[in-house]
Amino acid sequence: MEKFYNIDEQKFWNNNDIWLDSGHEWSSSFGTTENLWNKEIFDSIKEFRGKKILEIAPGFGRITQFLSILASELIVIDLNPLCIEKTKEKLGHHVLAYLTNDGKTLTGVRDNSQDLVFSFDSFVHMHANVTEEYVKEIFRVLKPGGQAFIHHSWLYGGSENSFDNSAGRANMSPEQFKGFVENNNMRIVSQTPIQFKPLNSWNGMDTISIFQK
């Protein structure tokens, strides 16, 4: 059987003890989560104000809080029930639907229903086969002309177990990710490496891919 995720990784993220500051600790390279949103994310998706947005793997809702203001309707979906529970506690009725999934599909989200699919700080840890399955599902749920904003790993040549690599990054290259997108009849709009500030050993490990159906 093909392995889609490591059960130990699932248990890791479903443990309340690792979320020391509800995930905001992972915004430290940008100063604050608000800085991360304003400097790395907002300009790329501001055109989707008042549109339908799906967020994959929201964690404890640190970016979700901003997406909920931007979107007319926001759906969040996560493998881990704890993440859905905490995001719901944080945002309540400001999110249209809170869904759990199997870690590779978007069951519960209708075909051709979303203007934007978004994910930050989650695909960086996903095995390539998980990413590939999600890209197939993103094609299914996006409206024609809709876009996806996916923050993913740019680390290639490490261990197949992402937890053995620096910062838990998965094996993935921009070319491999582009192949997944094009194989599903979508096109890459841009691929932008993230420059962490201050400069540190994480530079060159992540990229943001924006693609369109």
Predicted regions and their residues:
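A short acidic, Gly/Pro-enriched loop at the edge of an enzyme's catalytic core
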Residues: T107-V117
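Structural signature of beta-strand start/N-cap positions in the alpha/beta core
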Residues: K52, E73, S113-D115
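A short SAM/SAH-binding and catalytic strip from SAM-dependent methyltransferases
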Residues: L116-N129
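Class I SAM-dependent methyltransferase core
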Residues: E55
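A short glycine-rich, Lys/Arg-flanked "PGG" loop and its adjoining helix->strand segment in the class I
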Residues: E132-P144
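Class I (Rossmann-like) S-adenosyl-L-methionine-dependent methyltransferase catalytic domain
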Residues: M1-G50, G59-T107, M126-E133, Q147-Q212
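Conserved acidic functional residues
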Residues: T64, D111, D121
